[in-house]
């Protein structure tokens, strides 16, 4: 099994998979009589049809035992999915490029700085949320509507990956 190298999350490195939601290096303008900086359109919510709705939820995630065997990835073919950390803790991201099935050899892992969120583009393969802390909360923006919006792919045993603890 291949051990994934955990990369720091940057906009450039994550661009094939989605958007990094952060203020650092992002354009902004002043609103509210000059008392507020607006970092505008850091990500776009994608939905498949005009009947779909963008919704906001909170996910409360428990940490996984490390090292973690990455045996599956999921994707949301009908909409994007954003995770914004509410408690300021770094979290791990495991992704693979668009495709009918994820390719084990193309899987990448990232770690946020605790102030970054991410928005997976429609159809991007990813692991379910991976918190580093014992328990963590995330604001999630995704799609509600008709149709199955979650495909899962389980890797064959020889395709599985290892995610080691973040140092």
Swiss-Prot record:
InterPro entries: RmlC_Cupin_sf, UAH_cupin, Ureidogly_lyase, Ureidogly_lyase_bac, Ureidoglycolate_lyase_dom_sf. It is an enzyme of class 4 (lyase). Its cofactor is Ni(2+). Catalyzes the catabolism of the allantoin degradation intermediate (S)-ureidoglycolate, generating urea and glyoxylate. Involved in the utilization of allantoin as nitrogen source. Belongs to the ureidoglycolate lyase family. NCBIfam families: PRK03606.1-2, PRK13395.1. This is Ureidoglycolate lyase. It comes from Pseudomonas fluorescens (strain Pf0-1). The gene is allA.
């Amino acid at each position: 099994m291949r051990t994934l190298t955990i990369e720091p999350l940057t906009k450039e490195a994550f661009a094939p998979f989605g958007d990094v939601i952060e203020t650092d290096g992002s354009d902004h303008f002043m609103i509210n009589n000059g008392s507020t900086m607006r970092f505008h359109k850091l990500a776009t919510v994608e939905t498949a049809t005009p009947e779909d709705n963008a919704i906001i939820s909170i996910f409360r995630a428990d940490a996984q035992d490390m090292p973690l065997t990455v045996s599956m990835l999921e994707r949301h073919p009908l909409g994007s999915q954003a995770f914004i950390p509410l408690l300021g803790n770094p979290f791990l991201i495991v992704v693979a490029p668009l495709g009918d099935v994820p390719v084990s050899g193309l899987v990448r892992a990232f770690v946020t700085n605790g102030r970054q969120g991410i928005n997976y583009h429609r159809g991007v393969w990813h692991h379910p949320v991976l918190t580093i802390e014992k328990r963590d909360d995330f604001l999630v923006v995704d799609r509600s509507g008709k149709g199955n919006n979650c495909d899962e792919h389980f890797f064959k045993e020889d395709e599985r990956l290892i995610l080691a603890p973040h140092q």
